[in-house]
A protein has these predicted regions:
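A generic structural motif
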Residues: 107-109, 195-197, 323-330
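Glycine-rich, acidic
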Residues: 3-7, 18, 24, 127, ...
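A glycine-rich (often HGG/GG-containing) alpha/beta subdomain
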Residues: 45, 56-103, 135, 143-189
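Well-ordered alpha/beta subsegment
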Residues: 100, 105-108, 112, 117, ...
Length: 360
């Protein structure tokens, strides 16, 4: 089991540790609900160093990434980041990822922890044609996400970089608490604003401690993966392995906005064009339960007659809305907001309705 550079810190803070994507990770500290509300109302701090990072550079870098991802790299300028996904050649998704343009011909790519090796092999296979230089820096890179309405003012205490000048999905390289060459990125997976900072492992404890100290007055709390999941779900963000995977297309998953069919040739471009013309037979939708219950991954979705029309991909009891809600693939005819559906929970069909995301 791998450990992040902050493992000892989590143990010292009394975090409950669980195996996740080959890492021993903190699932919670004080408690999921408390951590969730801290991020929505004040600020929370997450160790997400298990994520993967690649540097892809050189004359072939842009063409390689433009070919293996769905989004359009032509819209990326230095200091800008882009959400995208890797199609698998059969219309499914290898992974979703964020691409940071560091400079001309230099890209920093962030992938999901569970897919580091898979993504590396997938991109490498196509790189035989493009000849870009690829470096996997996952093992020496740490990542802290500081999220919530007060996150920016906490981080600002530790850096001379003017954070208010970094728009959403933009980044800069700066100094934080004296640590140089930190990637300071206005991104996150909570929908509550804030930053993600990338740096070398040896600076992890220093920066964690500095943030803890800087955020005392604002009520900053350490948060685990469980709160990260309830936070992202309330915003309707996809989780790889649940809501998207090798069997789901970006168009089915509501990721048409990052699938730029007019950008030129790329993996599965023809498949997606055809799928767009013909329409998809199922769609990923948000739903809310109308009765008590907690929907979970893989629970069947049925219609009024009890016919299976889909399945739940992610579900929870929402701390903010105090109801069961989630994401599910349903037959397209049931995908319109307000459509009546039922979630099968312990052999009971619980009434639910399709809603637009975000939920909060």
């Amino acid at each position: 089991m791998k450990k992040t550079a902050l493992y000892n810190k989590h143990v010292e803070l009394g975090a409950k540790m669980v195996p996740f994507a080959g890492f021993d990770m903190p699932v919670q500290y004080a408690g999921v609900t408390e951590e969730h509300f801290a991020v929505r109302e004040k600020a929370g701090m997450f160790d997400v160093s298990h994520m993967g990072q690649f540097i892809i550079e050189g004359p072939g870098a842009k063409d390689l990434l433009q070919y293996v991802t769905t989004n359009d790299l032509n819209t990326l300028t230095d200091g800008k980041a882009q959400y995208s996904c890797l199609p698998n050649g059969q219309g499914g998704i290898v992974d979703d990822l964020i691409i940071y343009k560091m400079a001309d011909e230099v890209y920093f790519v962030v992938v999901n922890a569970s897919n580091i090796e898979k993504d590396w092999n997938h991109i490498s296979k196509f790189n035989e044609k493009f000849g870009a230089k690829m470096t996997n820096i996952s093992d020496e890179t740490s990542l802290i996400a500081i999220q919530g309405p007060l996150a920016t003012q906490i981080l600002q205490k530790l850096t001379s970089t003017n954070l208010s000048e970094i728009p959403y999905y933009h980044f800069t390289i700066g100094t934080v608490d004296g640590v140089q060459d930190v990637i300071i990125s206005n991104t996150g997976y909570t929908g509550s604003g804030g930053f993600e900072i990338y740096f070398k492992n040896e600076n992890a404890e220093q920066l964690w401690n500095a943030l803890t100290e800087a955020g005392k007055e604002e009520g900053l709390v350490p948060c685990g993966l469980a709160a990260r999941d309830t936070l992202r779900l309330e915003k309707g963000f996809c989780l790889y392995g649940n809501d998207i995977d090798d069997s789901t297309s970006p168009l089915e998953a509501g990721l048409g906005w990052i699938t730029k069919l007019g950008k030129g040739d790329f993996v599965d471009a023809e498949f997606f064009k055809k799928q767009k013309e013909e329409g998809v037979s199922r769609k990923l939708v948000g739903f809310e339960l109308l009765d008590k219950g907690v929907p979970r991954h893989d629970y069947p979705v049925v219609d009024a007659e009890g016919n299976v029309i889909g399945k739940v991909t992610s579900g929870t009891s929402s701390p903010m809305k105090k109801i069961g809600l989630g994401l599910a693939y349903v037959k397209t005819e049931f995908s319109k907001p307000e459509s009546a559906i039922f979630i099968q929970i312990r052999n009971k069909n619980i009434p639910a309705k399709v809603v637009k995301t975000p939920f909060v």
